[in-house]
From Swiss-Prot:
Keywords in alphabetical order: ATP-binding, Cytoplasm, Ligase, Nucleotide-binding, Pantothenate biosynthesis
Organism encoding this protein: Rhodopseudomonas palustris (strain BisA53)
Lineage: Bacteria, Pseudomonadati, Pseudomonadota, Alphaproteobacteria, Hyphomicrobiales
Known EC number: 6.3.2.1
Cell location: Cytoplasm
Subunit structure: Homodimer.
Protein name as catalogued: Pantothenate synthetase
Amino acid sequence: MSRSPIVARTLPALRRALDTIRARKASVALVPTMGALHEGHLALVRLAKRRASKVVVSIFVNPAQFAPNEDFASYPRTWKADLAKLAAEKVDLVWNPDAKTMYPAGFASKIITEGPALVGLEDRFRPQFFGGVTTVVGKLFAQVRPDFALFGEKDFQQLRVVTRMARDLDLGAKVIGVPTMRERDGLAMSSRNVYLSPEHRSAAPTLYRSLKEAAKRLRAGDDIDVALGGGAEMITAAGFKLDYLEARHAETLEPIASLEDGPIRLLVAARIGSTRLIDNVAV
């Protein structure tokens, strides 16, 4: 039987647990999550265990990154199952604050980041998202003071924004991106996949197939607009409403015009039924 991790729900409890860890000169890796854990999250945990002596997983459904019309109230919350999975992975500490702990009465601060990584992708469709993400991640870094922090590459724009923020603000954590975990048919693992109807679940892997096809055409020498146009046709033909399909510089996320502009990342967001999915691939 797996030993349950220590669970901290208040800042004093978190600090006591971390003081014990730090007294042993142990390195700490943080895996920030919103719960509803799946194999993609557990891959982050396993890599964290290889990088650091102790692993902290935060579980906090962050209201600040949801718009009023989004799924904050219905977002999957599976605490007992999450804790069992983390116990099986031998996680050391789970940080599970509530909203009043993270955003107490009178809270009025926000971390705002700028630069090309923030422009023209998710921000166009979820304008308050990154202000909520950077603020909560900044708070988590201040609370846990990790040596390493692990984020999945599925949320690639988020990964680049958080990496830049940690570097610019000297937050002390080395941000590590971890390749996207996928279902057997290629669909990127996501807590929101549970929203998909059987019909939409069958169509969902088209998103990844379209990215792979566009990347293949780019490597074969196709013009970027032609390759992306073909990918967009595949996506809409499968029943998706496309938000964006773009080629960006893989490090800065600046828009690019040709393969010569640097390493390329293709990023897509699209909606099928009521579910919005994102994905990305390297070229």
